[in-house]
Amino acid sequence: GIRERGLMPKIEGLLSGYLGDASIGKIVLDLATEIKAANPDAIWLCDPVMGDTDTGVFVRPDIPQFMKEHFLNGLADMTKPNQFELELLSGRKMRSRQETVDTARELFTDKGCRVTFVTSLLTPDVPEDTVETLAITKDDAWVVRTPLVERKPTPNGQGDTFSSVALGTYLKTKSAKDALEAAVNTLYGLVSHMDSGALDLPLIDEQRQILSPEPVSYTHLRAHE
């Protein structure tokens, strides 16, 4: 329908996430290629959803290899792996924040990706009871540290919410730092204000956390050369 209406050149952003099958990934790749041909300024944020530390790999067995073969070529402008997914794609364990930055650059930004967000970072140099999120570009990197808020069961939609806010902010400001801060503040605010045992983020009841999120009081930013 979008193609038939001639709207491809007007698309400014594309967000992709969980893939039920590698064949769907091929459709996403073809669509991203078509959109960028129609509008070279369009931004594609690819969230390579494959698993997490507490669940292991939860996608079909062919997805990780598909990601390695097709999504590490620089076509995506932005990526958002969590620590587990970055380790899965790189084949090595992250032992420090700086190693995480270097690995993200090797896999993504050195191949043309503008920004890589690494979420759920719990390397040994991250202080206890906190979690870090990184935004990494070719020349700089920023880190935001927040208290580790664990919810059981894990709320649905956290990755989608982060990616949506990050992409939307980047489209407005073209700033990786702004996108990182907005996404982390929004997600932390939503998770902090949700009822214990709830399955979904309170996107309606806590809309203010999306429109005007509360800054995390001890957020700090740091650039890496």
Where are these regions (language model features)?
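Glycine-rich nucleotide/cofactor/substrate-binding loop typically near the N-terminus or early
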Residues: 1-27, 31-32
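Glycine/small-residue-rich loop that forms an oxyanion/phosphate-binding "nest" at active or ligand-binding sites
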Residues: 32, 43, 48, 53-54, ...
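A short helix->loop->beta-strand "cap" motif at the edges of active sites that frequently abuts
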Residues: 35-43, 112-114
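Short, small-residue alpha-helix embedded
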Residues: 88, 152-176
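Short, well-structured alpha-helical segments that form the helix of a local strand-helix-strand
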Residues: 103-105, 176-190
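Short arginine-rich
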Residues: 112-113, 186-198
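Conserved small/polar residues in nucleotide/adenosyl-binding loops
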Residues: 219-225
